[in-house]
């Protein structure tokens, strides 16, 4: 960048008075000090002679004798000597030679100085021209850069305008819709929680009317003309006390005693040995507008009772399940027995039929070899997180199927089916949602895999009898 002495189109600036240097200020750092030019010598040589004096009237004219000038005298005495002699001329030239030589030398010096000054001036002018060209190139480059930045700014401005006018409102509408959806779900969950809190405010009791008809199990009740699916009292043995169960009188000709039911996650199945032994949960609730308990709740009938019922004679087990799309499958085992507590409620199942996959006998169909064998449930002991009877043989007490998979069950190492696992809304879940990072949902691997928790699952038993 160089300072300029030109206005460069700044005609619109306010006019100010010029200083002593006008518009060319002297910059001591960038300019040489100005030098004075030599003074030229005075002009020498002859001039006019003095004018003759004019005689006044009456004045006597005096004859003037011209001096001897070593030359020829003019005929007219007033004109004096015509020309000097050679010697006189030589003397005159000699007298005038020195000042003339000095004047010539001075002139030569003056010419040299003027030449040097002209060369410096030319160089300065050339420098100014180059500076001017450089300034013009800079101005052009700056204009190009400004134009380029202006183009970029215009594009960014258009993008911002487009984003602000279109994208952001669209995203805001989407977010608003999501928030409304979440608000609706939260309100529903709050309502469900309030309902469950009302259920759990006091120990679970049944306030429904219980039918008079009874029997040792639900098959006997249907044979005694108890045809409605609801809660009944059964008494397997005369020596035992009657207890409540839910009887399914519609599925596969009815007569099914429900020993387990999952449908809404309202009951925690992560319990100790004694609750699983005795049973827990809500057997049934009253149907809307009806005075009987026609809606099954979530419950586990109890290992002692299940063992008692299955040891009364050959027993079938029907497992029904439903996913979150409403699709349903079943697993029917025509042989089902649970041993007593002394034998750790050991499981025995046989003769599978159905559409869900034979998870209890064959293990997880996705696995092969030893890995599949470790998921077979048949012949396993019952385990809870405080009574470890599973098939996972490890010295690490933390490695326990019931603790990691959320419920009590006939675990191997660990499961292909997990009906008593943790309840996950929506079906699909991931390891980071699980308490221990395991597939701890209400799982039937042979149908929906490890990471899908069923919406509904129930286990029902009925005495075996020949079909007509």
Curated annotation (Swiss-Prot):
The record marks 21-22 as: Cleavage. Detected in blood plasma (at protein level). SUPFAM superfamilies: Fibrinogen C-terminal domain-like, Fibrinogen coiled-coil and central regions. Residues 24-34 have a biased composition (Basic and acidic residues). The keyword Cell wall biogenesis/degradation does not apply. The modification Pyrrolidone carboxylic acid is found at residue 1. Residues 1-10 have a biased composition (Acidic residues). Glycans are attached at residues 4, 371. It is found in: Secreted. Disulfide bonds join 208-293, 218-247, 401-414. The keyword Disulfide bond applies. GO terms for biological process: adaptive immune response; blood coagulation, fibrin clot formation; cell-matrix adhesion; innate immune response; platelet aggregation; protein polymerization. One of its GO terms (cellular component) is fibrinogen complex. GO terms for molecular function: signaling receptor binding. It holds the Pfam family Fib_alpha. Residues 88-204 form a coiled coil. Residues 209-465 form the Fibrinogen C-terminal domain. Keywords: Adaptive immunity, Blood coagulation, Coiled coil, Disulfide bond, Glycoprotein, Hemostasis, Immunity, Innate immunity, Pyrrolidone carboxylic acid, Secreted, Sulfation. A long coiled coil structure formed by 3 polypeptide chains connects the central nodule to the C-terminal domains (distal nodules). The long C-terminal ends of the alpha chains fold back, contributing a fourth strand to the coiled coil structure. Cleaved by the protease thrombin to yield monomers which, together with fibrinogen alpha (FGA) and fibrinogen gamma (FGG), polymerize to form an insoluble fibrin matrix. Fibrin has a major function in hemostasis as one of the primary components of blood clots. In addition, functions during the early stages of wound repair to stabilize the lesion and guide cell migration during re-epithelialization. Was originally thought to be essential for platelet aggregation, based on in vitro studies using anticoagulated blood. Heterohexamer; disulfide linked. Contains 2 sets of 3 non-identical chains (alpha, beta and gamma). The 2 heterotrimers are in head to head conformation with the N-termini in a small central domain. This is Fibrinogen beta chain. It comes from Bos taurus (Bovine). The lineage of its organism: Eukaryota, Metazoa, Chordata, Craniata, Vertebrata.
């Amino acid at each position: 960048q160089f300072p300029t002495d030109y206005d460069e189109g700044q005609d619109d600036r306010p006019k100010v008075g010029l200083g002593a240097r006008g518009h060319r200020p002297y910059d001591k750092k960038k300019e040489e000090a100005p030098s004075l030019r030599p003074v030229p010598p005075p002009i020498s040589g002859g001039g006019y002679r003095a004018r003759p004096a004019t005689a006044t009237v009456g004045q006597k004219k005096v004859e003037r004798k011209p001096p001897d000038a070593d030359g020829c005298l003019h005929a007219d005495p007033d004109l004096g000597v015509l020309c000097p002699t050679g010697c006189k001329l030589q003397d005159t030239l000699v007298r005038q030679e020195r000042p003339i030589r000095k004047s010539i030398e001075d002139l030569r010096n003056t010419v040299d100085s003027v030449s040097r000054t002209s060369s410096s001036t030319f160089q300065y002018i050339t420098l100014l021209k180059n500076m001017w060209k450089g300034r013009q190139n800079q101005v052009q480059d700056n204009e190009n850069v400004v134009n380029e930045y202006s183009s970029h700014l215009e594009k960014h401005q258009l993008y911002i305008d487009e984003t602000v006018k279109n994208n952001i409102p669209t995203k805001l509408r989407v977010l608003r819709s999501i928030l409304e959806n979440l608000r609706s779900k939260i309100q529903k969950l709050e309502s469900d929680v309030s309902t469950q809190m009302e259920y759990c405010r006091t120990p679970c009791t049944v306030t429904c009317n219980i039918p008079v008809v009874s029997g040792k199990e639900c098959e006997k009740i249907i044979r005694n003309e108890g045809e409605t699916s609801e809660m009944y009292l059964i008494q397997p043995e005369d020596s035992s006390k009657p207890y409540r169960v839910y009887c399914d009188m519609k599925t596969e000709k009815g007569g099914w005693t429900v020993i387990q039911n999952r449908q809404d996650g309202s009951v925690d199945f992560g319990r100790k040995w004694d609750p699983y032994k005795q049973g827990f949960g809500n057997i049934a609730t009253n149907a809307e507008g009806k005075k009987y308990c026609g809606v099954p709740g979530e419950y586990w009938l109890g290992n002692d009772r299940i063992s008692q019922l299955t040891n009364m004679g050959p027993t079938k087990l029907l497992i029904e399940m439903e996913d979150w799309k409403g699709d349903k499958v079943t697993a029917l085992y025509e042989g089902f027995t649970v041993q007593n507590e002394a034998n750790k409620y050991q499981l025995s199942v046989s003769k599978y039929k159905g559409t869900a996959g034979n998870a209890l006998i064959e293990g997880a169909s996705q696995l092969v070899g030893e890995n599949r064998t470790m998921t077979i449930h048949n012949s396993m002991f019952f385990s809870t997180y405080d009574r470890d009877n599973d098939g996972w043989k490890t010295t690490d007490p933390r490695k326990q199927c019931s603790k990691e998979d959320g419920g009590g069950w006939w675990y191997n190492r660990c499961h292909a089916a997990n009906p008593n696992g943790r309840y996950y809304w929506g079906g699909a879940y991931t390891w980071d949602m699980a308490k221990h990072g395991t597939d701890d949902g209400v799982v039937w691997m042979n149908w929906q895999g490890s990471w899908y928790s069923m919406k509904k699952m129930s286990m029902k038993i009925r005495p075996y009898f020949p079909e007509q």
